[in-house]
């Protein structure tokens, strides 16, 4: 019997992270014999300093390519354990560095990784069974730190949520726009959620004037008060639904399927929307969101949260969706077909 530890930010009721674990578990069940493999999720209370009972440690989906998690993987290697990275990515890279990176002008990531952290990253990548990262910006950042030769082993496999499928029958869309709102405790580009919220309120009012109804939804209990405040500021109960229910991924996909478009704060809200065949406007609040839209070729639908014209940009992107919605979904499904086998290759090609 092989014991596999899945490391993720799980056990905190955050749907985005929980669904990544669910996908890992379900993909294991599809390819691996459950009589030969035991999966252990890193729920709160799991001792991440003692890997004695595990054979393989998998760093799962999310933005977990951080010095602390990489140190855990190196510790596991030093204990003779196998390690793998599956769909994880970088985050926390400053906006100015994101722009330099995108334009191939960034030479260092010393704000995020000191030399000792880069040494750990190099050791982990060199000795891992499998290194699959979320998106092209993550891979580019690794190349800056290690050089392109040492980063060759790093594959862009996509966000594991690309494996999500809509299980229910199609239903007619309504004149409804979903809005996912919440908080990052001001740890976002622009560093000012209050200004962002005011611009979103104005965009919401203008969308109602255009004839849309709005559906405000949440991904995490901590986000509920922020959704309530947004609802109260829009102050139009006849045209706005506030849904505080914390759904499973499939339940939320079914809810979103009624929308014509969504505007999303949290990264995986975009993936749930796209799974529901609904084009998504991503509020680019940190590096990870830009990494994802670059992966699926939907950069024209992202709005940086430091934008001073967010209201105008939301309305422009809604117009793009009104005019080209089917093309947007075709682009997403093309990307999905590319990355699904790469995400499954960890399991299908016997790395585990």
Across the structure, where does each feature detected by a protein language model lie?
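Active-site anion-handling motifs in enzyme catalytic cores
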Residues: 1-352
């Amino acid at each position: 019997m092989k014991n596999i530890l899945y490391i993720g930010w799980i056990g905190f009721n955050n749907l985005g992270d929980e669904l990544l674990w669910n996908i890992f578990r379900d993909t294991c069940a599809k390819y691996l014999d459950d009589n030969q493999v035991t999966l252990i999720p890193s729920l709160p209370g799991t001792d991440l300093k003692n890997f004695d009972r595990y054979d393989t440690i998998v760093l799962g989906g999310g933005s977990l390519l951080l010095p602390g998690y990489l140190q855990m993987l190196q510790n596991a290697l030093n204990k003779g354990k196998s390690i793998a990275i599956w769909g994880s990515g970088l985050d926390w890279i400053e906006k100015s560095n994101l722009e330099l990176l995108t334009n191939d002008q960034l030479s260092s990531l010393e704000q995020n990784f000191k030399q000792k952290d880069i040494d750990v990253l190099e050791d982990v990548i060199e000795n891992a069974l499998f290194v699959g990262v979320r998106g092209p910006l993550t891979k580019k950042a690794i190349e800056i730190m290690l050089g392109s030769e040492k980063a060759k082993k790093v594959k862009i496999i996509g966000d594991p949520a690309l494996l999500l499928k809509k299980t229910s029958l199609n239903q007619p869309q309504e004149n409804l726009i979903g809005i996912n709102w919440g908080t990052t405790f001001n740890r976002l580009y622009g560093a000012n959620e209050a200004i962002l919220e005011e611009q979103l309120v104005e965009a919401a009012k203008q969308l109602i004037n255009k004839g849309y109804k709005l559906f405000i939804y949440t991904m995490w209990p901590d986000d509920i008060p922020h959704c309530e405040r947004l609802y109260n500021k829009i102050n139009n109960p006849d045209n706005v639904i506030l849904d505080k229910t914390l759904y499973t991924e499939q339940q939320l996909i079914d809810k979103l399927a009624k929308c014509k478009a969504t505007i999303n704060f949290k990264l995986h809200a975009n993936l749930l929307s796209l799974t529901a065949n609904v084009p998504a406007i991503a509020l680019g609040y940190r590096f990870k969101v830009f990494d994802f839209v670059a992966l699926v070729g939907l950069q024209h639908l992202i709005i940086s949260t430091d934008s001073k014209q967010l209201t105008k940009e939301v309305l422009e992107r809604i117009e793009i969706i009104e005019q080209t919605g089917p093309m947007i979904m075709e682009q997403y499904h093309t990307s999905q077909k590319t990355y699904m086998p790469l995400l499954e290759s960890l399991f299908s090609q016997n790395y585990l």
